[in-house]
């Protein structure tokens, strides 16, 4: 699978959208400031108006995946990332890189066998370390950046330079090849094995803890489940299409 045809589109989005402030948030802040200065002046008796409704919790989206699964990469780059760009203010993402791997305890040390070989195990650990060491948004964007590329391991440095320049690729690789990487992968194995119902394939997507059978419906489901009074404009027009998965 070649990912280069979407690189220009993705790179532009990655550079522009993380810096955007959701319009709803900007509008509410400016409105509050305006109302505060015009309706309640000094020395006036200011009555309390209606209390604002508590903010609705974001929709929780959890992705259980493996780094070299083509279907996982497609979902991450073409579905999850664009959905986050469009409705980031109403969703919360959790990534669990492990997928269809298996673990065993050998003389007190955890060893892993991955569906797509040793490289996938190493990349799973790299992404687990990114999630462990970076701020959540920076980790997500760095992983998306890597997953879009053909040679993911070599793209760790360039992607970090864009989204977490204060973190060296050497520190991430030290984590991935050391005890911390093994521990993180074991924790991801436990999270994956504890799924109920168990995952049938990857990408395995949970939305508010419930399996999403058709990953292409992610944007639609997030919009439907969000209970806030104001939703992003994109929620009014959505199209779905079927996607393939990688079975065990």
Curated annotation (Swiss-Prot):
* PANTHER family per the UniProt record, alphabetical: GAMMA-INTERFERON INDUCIBLE LYSOSOMAL THIOL REDUCTASE GILT, GAMMA-INTERFERON-INDUCIBLE LYSOSOMAL THIOL REDUCTASE
- Print the miscellaneous field: Both precursor form and mature form have thiol reductase activity.
Q: Which residue ranges traverse the bilayer?
A: none
Location within or outside the cell: Secreted; Lysosome
Q: Hey, what's the signal peptide range on this chain?
A: 1-26
Classification via Pfam families: GILT
GO CC terms in record: cell junction; cytosol; extracellular region; lysosome
User: Source species, please?
Assistant: Mus musculus (Mouse)
Keyword terms, alphabetized: Disulfide bond, Glycoprotein, Immunity, Lysosome, Oxidoreductase, Redox-active center, Secreted, Signal
Q: What is the lineage of its organism?
A: Eukaryota, Metazoa, Chordata, Craniata, Vertebrata
Q: Which InterPro entries match?
A: Interferon-induced_GILT
Q: Name one GO molecular function term.
A: oxidoreductase activity, acting on a sulfur group of donors, disulfide as acceptor
Assembly information from the UniProt record:
Dimer; disulfide-linked.
GO BP term (any one): antigen processing and presentation of exogenous peptide antigen via MHC class II
Upon gene disruption, the observed phenotype is: Mice lacking GILT are deficient in generating major histocompatibility complex class-II-restricted CD4(+) T-cell responses to protein antigens that contain disulfide bonds. Mice are partially protected from Listeria monocytogenes infection, they exhibit reduced bacterial replication in spleen and liver. Bacterial escape from the phagosome is impaired in the macrophages of these mice.
Instruction: Report the top EC class in one word.
Output: oxidoreductase
Q: Give the UniProt family note.
A: Belongs to the GILT family.
Enzyme Commission designation: 1.8.-.-
Function summary:
Lysosomal thiol reductase that can reduce protein disulfide bonds. May facilitate the complete unfolding of proteins destined for lysosomal degradation. Plays an important role in antigen processing. Facilitates the generation of MHC class II-restricted epitodes from disulfide bond-containing antigen by the endocytic reduction of disulfide bonds. Also facilitates MHC class I-restricted recognition of exogenous antigens containing disulfide bonds by CD8+ T-cells or crosspresentation.
In what way is this protein post-translationally modified? N-glycosylated. Sugar chains contain mannose-6-phosphate.
Paired cysteines (S-S) = 69-72
Q: What is this protein called?
A: Gamma-interferon-inducible lysosomal thiol reductase
């Amino acid at each position: 699978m070649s990912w280069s045809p979407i690189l220009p589109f993705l790179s532009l989005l990655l550079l522009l959208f993380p810096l955007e402030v959701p319009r709803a948030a900007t509008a509410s802040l400016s409105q509050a400031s305006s109302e505060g200065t015009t309706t309640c002046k000094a020395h006036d008796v200011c009555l309390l108006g209606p209390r604002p409704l508590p903010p609705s919790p974001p929709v929780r989206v959890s992705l259980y995946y493996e780094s070299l699964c083509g279907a996982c990469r497609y979902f991450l780059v073409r579905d999850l990332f664009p959905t986050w760009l469009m409705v980031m203010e109403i969703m919360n993402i959790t990534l669990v890189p492990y997928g269809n791997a298996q673990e065993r305890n050998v003389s007190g040390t955890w060893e892993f066998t991955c569906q797509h070989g040793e490289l996938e195990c190493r990349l799973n650990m790299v992404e687990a370390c990114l999630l462990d060491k970076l701020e959540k948004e920076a980790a997500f964007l760095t992983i998306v950046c890597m997953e879009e590329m053909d040679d993911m391991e070599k793209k760790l440095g360039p992607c970090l330079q864009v989204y977490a320049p204060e973190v060296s690729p050497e520190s991430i690789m030290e984590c991935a090849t050391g005890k911390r990487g093994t521990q993180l992968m074991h924790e991801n194995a436990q999270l994956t094995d504890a799924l109920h119902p168990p995952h049938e394939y990857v990408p395995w997507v949970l939305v508010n803890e419930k399996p999403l059978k058709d990953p292409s419906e992610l944007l639609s489901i997030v919009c439907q489940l969000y209970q806030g009074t104001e939703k992003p404009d994109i929620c009014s027009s959505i199209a779905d299409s079927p996607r393939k998965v990688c079975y065990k």
